[in-house]
Structure formats: structure tokens, C-alpha cells
Amino acid sequence: MRQDAGLASIHNNELNTGRQISALLKKDLLLETRQQHTFYGILLYIASTIFVIYLTLEDPDASTWNAIFWITQLFICINAVAKSFLQEAKGRMLYYYTITSPVSFILSKLAYNAVLMIAMSIINLLVYTAMLGNPTSNYISFCMIGILGGCGLGLIFTMLAAIASKALQQASLMAILGFPLILPQLMMLVRLSKTAFGEIFNNGIPLQMIALLLAFDLLMIILSVILFPFLWKD
């Protein structure tokens, strides 16, 4: 009987966590639709950044095209994801503290920002291709890598934004914490993207890099779930 009660309790907790995540995701979507100036601001940032690159380079070679795409992707992620915690007022966070668990809260933020960055990656890629051309030999492959990279960057900066939101110098702290985490991932994404330009790798190398990127994303989720409850109590 005790075992059955324990299993029922676990099942109920899982249901509650799922409902909390769903409700928090709906809340973030509702805020995004009500505060459309933020979304349009990011779109303007994408268009203006790529337009400046177009005016400067016009017809970049494949290596430059690839490198600048990921640099653009990085700064888009900083602008899009950093606000997820910075816009939350202290009173609102106190309210969340009373109605949801820290795990549900951080998982909802991770999921929302991952989806947001997938959308931003697609938009960035379309605008980038329209203005700077398409030197890739396998555009679909590059799109998939871009989506994978955007999702991973979103997960990293969600965790960093959660940590930085508890500090005074939030932007500086995000830059300091983010550099050692972002650099290896960006280097791997740039290298993996070269497969879409026709560069030949040894058998299994691209799959190994994809597996490493997915493992890194999973590590970010696990670390967020472990560390965020301590920030939640602060």
C-alpha cells in the first residue's frame, strides 16, 4: 500500500510539473504577443546587422560567410534570450515562488528560449541568404545545423541569464561567464557547418560533432535543473 501511495505521489508530481511548465510557457507566449515591440526590435536588429554586413562585404567568400553567420547568430541570441530573466520584476518572481517549483520554472524558460532561438535562426538564415547569397552546396544541411546551434545557444544563455539576474552587473557577468562556454560550441558549429560547403571529413566525424553538441545541450539542461533551485531560494 505504501509503495502504491508513493508511486501515485510521484505520478501526481510529474503531472503537476507538466502542468506548471505548460502554464508558464503559455504565460511567456502571451507576454510575447502583448509586448510585440520586443520581438520586432529583434527582427530590426537582424535586418540592420545583416544589411551593414552586406554594405561592407557585398560578396563574401564561403569561409567568411560561415563565420559571420555564427557571429550574427551569437549576438541575436544575447539580445533575444537575455531579456527572459532581466524583464522579470522582483515582485513577479516572488509570485512565481509561491505558485510553482524552481525546476518547472527553469524548464519552461529553457523550452521557450530554445523554441524562440529556433525561430530566430530560421529568420536570420532567410534574411542572411537573401542579402548575402547562398554559397553552400547543401543548404538544407546548413539549415539543420543552424537550428541545432540556435537551440544550443538559447539553452546556454538561458542558464547564464538566470545566474546574472541575481547580480548587479548583469551584462558584464553574462559576458564573463559565457565566454568559456560559448567559445568551444561556436568553434564546433563553425567546423560542422563546413560540411554544408562541401568540405570532406573523415567518416563519422560530423556525427561525433553532432553528438557532442547534443550532449552539451543536455549538460546545460541538467546543470540548470541542479543549480537554479539554489538561485530560487535567494
Description of each model-found segment:
Residues Q36-E58, I68-C77, L177-M188, F216-L223:
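Hydrophobic alpha-helical transmembrane segments of multi-pass membrane transport/permease proteins
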Residues T56-P60, L126-I145, S193-I210:
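Membrane-interfacial helix-loop-helix connectors in multipass membrane proteins
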Residues P102-T129:
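Selective transmembrane-helix segments that form parts of the transport pathway or gating/packing helices
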Residues G152-M159, Q185-E199:
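Transmembrane alpha-helical segments of integral membrane proteins
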Residues A130, D217-D234:
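Junction motif at the cytosolic side of a transmembrane helix
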Residues I10-G41:
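Aromatic- and glycine-rich beta-strand/loop motifs that create alpha-glucan
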Residues E32-T33, I78-Y96:
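Transmembrane helix boundary and interhelical loop/hinge segments in multi-pass membrane proteins
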Residues I147-F179, W232-D234:
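A structural motif at transmembrane helix-loop-helix junctions in multipass membrane proteins
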